[in-house]
Curated annotation (Swiss-Prot):
It is an enzyme of class 3 (hydrolase). Its EC number is 3.1.4.-. GO terms for molecular function: phosphoric diester hydrolase activity. SMART domains: HAMP (SM00304), HDc (SM00471). GO terms for cellular component: plasma membrane. This is Cyclic di-GMP phosphodiesterase VC_1295. It is found in: Cell inner membrane. Phosphodiesterase (PDE) that catalyzes the hydrolysis of cyclic diguanylate (c-di-GMP) to GMP in vitro. Increases motility and decreases biofilm formation in vivo. Pfam families: HAMP, HD_5, MASE10. It comes from Vibrio cholerae serotype O1 (strain ATCC 39315 / El Tor Inaba N16961). Keywords: c-di-GMP, Cell inner membrane, Cell membrane, Hydrolase, Membrane, Transmembrane, Transmembrane helix. The chain crosses the membrane at residues 14-34, 49-69, 80-100, 111-131, 160-180, 205-225. Its main location: membrane.
């Protein structure tokens, strides 16, 4: 029976007429069997009488549930335990009154009718409520966050204790009623006790009630455990996203209980962490702009050069990220760090004398030797910041770019004559971006080259000055380079 009840319950949304009818039909059949086993007076009625009377009451109850109560506030709040328990209790009153007037049943028999229908109403409502909430959880988008309801907080521990107490009490009451009924029956049928058939009948009745109660209890516990697993799985997936650095994720809050409160407090903590992270990022960006502006103030380079080169680097990185050999390194977070760090590639120029840095003509060999020190100066400055502020991905990438963006693929660059993949990818990307922008920009010692001419020079340098893979990426996104150059033009 447990499997059948579960299969019905899992078809539910918030309200499902066939499901409700199926569970009401099941409750009606079981109640009809229940009555003949707990009440000696009801046991005197024929199967046809009980089936007709109980069937009529349960069909009427379902019709009321289907028409008048489907939009009831309890139904809209998925509080089906209250709704179905109250409905079947109300329907048990006229049935008990009918038995009292038609068959002169005693008060205890009438109370057994009230108890039985109310009990099956509780079980039916519990299955409908749990299955409805489970389906809602499974259909709800992972990103949707619900506020805690304004209802009074319901403790999971108290709910479990209450359910266990209710089930134990129900089992005790029902078995007691069966025992009393069987004692009455044996008193009037002593021969059944002597021939042993009475014992078998009593065992069957106890087994029937245990099976019915056990089936409902098992179905309720299975649905409840599935709902808890769904909630915990959702929260675990959210926390896994947080551990990967996504502080915009929030834990879904499904209920006003301990789990809901933990999720709400966790979300408040994530709000605070996100605000702190945003403040740190803002401070970092201000530092980047300040350092970049300092370098610009001593160089002939313009602010637009800084903007263009970081956009070039981002375009190249996003293209290469689509390839398996680069996808592990070039994650969205890493590309964002590249983009933020790129403006610091020439920060070391603040340590170059003005006589060299601002010289309008060609540098002498001695002057060029001095100029070639700016990558080391920039990397050393960022290393000092790293020692004082602690290691961070941003400072590490900024230091890489500053130190290696003048290295060449064939090992003829500076300052360390690194060759091939010994040059960090960040430096290889910036090398092409920096040269391209220098080629298309006007300087006191040269006019601005066209995109096509700059492109030809870069292609010629593939495998010598530049990483061939980066050159291929440049050719694939050259239209983006043209658009970036047009958007961030030097001021006239």
């Amino acid at each position: 029976m447990t499997i059948w009840v579960l299969s019905l319950a899992m078809k539910n949304t918030i309200y499902h007429a066939p499901l409700t009818f199926g569970l009401y039909a099941l409750a009606g059949v079981l109640f009809a069997l229940y009555t003949s086993r707990v009440c000696p007076f009801l046991a005197t009625l024929s199967t046809r009488e009980i089936a007709t009377q109980v069937g009529a009451v349960f069909i009427l109850a379902w019709l009321i549930r289907h028409t008048l109560l489907r939009q009831h506030i309890w139904a809209r709040k998925q509080q089906f335990i209250q709704l179905d328990t109250a409905l079947l209790f109300a329907m048990s009153l006229p049935l008990a009154l009918y038995y009292n007037l038609q068959y002169q049943f005693t008060l205890d028999s009438n109370l057994k009718v009230l108890f039985g229908m109310t009990l099956f109403g509780f079980f039916t409502g519990a299955l409908l409520q749990l299955s409805s909430k489970l389906r809602t959880l499974r259909q709800m988008p992972q990103s949707q966050n619900l506020a805690l309801s304004s209802d009074e907080r319901r403790s999971l521990v108290k709910q479990l204790i209450g359910l266990i107490v209710l089930l134990i009490s129900t089992l005790t009451v029902m078995l007691s009623m069966v025992a009393i009924k069987d004692i009455h029956w044996l008193e009037n049928n002593p021969a059944r006790l002597l021939d042993g058939s009475g014992k078998i009948s009593i065992v069957k009745e106890f087994a029937f009630l245990s099976l019915v109660l056990g089936g409902y209890i098992t179905a309720i516990l299975v649905l409840w455990s599935r709902m808890m697993k769904e909630i915990l799985d959702h929260q675990e997936r959210s926390l896994q996203a947080v551990t990967q650095g996504n502080l915009q994720v929030r834990l879904p809050v499904y209920s006003n209980d301990e789990l809901g409160n933990v999720a709400m407090l966790t979300n408040q903590m994530l709000d605070s962490l996100e605000a702190t992270q945003n403040e740190v990022k803002t401070t970092r960006d201000v530092a980047i702009v300040s350092l970049s502006a300092l370098a610009e103030s001593r160089d002939n380079e313009t602010g637009a050069h800084i903007l263009r080169t970081q956009e070039y680097v981002k375009a190249l990185a996003e293209y290469l990220a689509a390839f398996p050999q680069y996808s592990t390194l070039l994650t969205p977070a890493y590309i964002e760090l590249l983009y933020k760090s790129a403006p610091l590639h020439d920060v070391g120029k603040v340590g170059i004398p003005d006589s060299v840095l601002l010289k309008p003509g060609k540098l002498t060999d001695e002057e060029f030797t001095v100029m070639k020190e700016h990558p080391r100066i920039g990397a050393q400055a960022l290393a000092i910041a790293e020692r004082h502020l602690g290691t961070s991905s941003f400072l590490a990438i900024a230091k890489e770019i500053a130190l290696t963006h003048h290295e060449k693929w064939d090992g003829t660059g500076y300052p360390a004559q690194l060759q091939g993949e010994a040059i960090p990818l960040s430096g290889r990307l910036m090398a092409l971006a920096d040269v391209y922008d220098a080629l298309i920009s006007a300087r006191v010692y040269k006019p601005a080259f066209s995109h096509d001419k700059a492109k030809a020079i870069i292609v010629e340098g593939s495998g010598h000055h530049f990483d061939p893979a980066v050159v291929e990426a440049f050719l694939a996104v050259e239209e983006k380079f043209v658009a970036i150059a047009a958007h961030f033009k030097d001021a006239a």
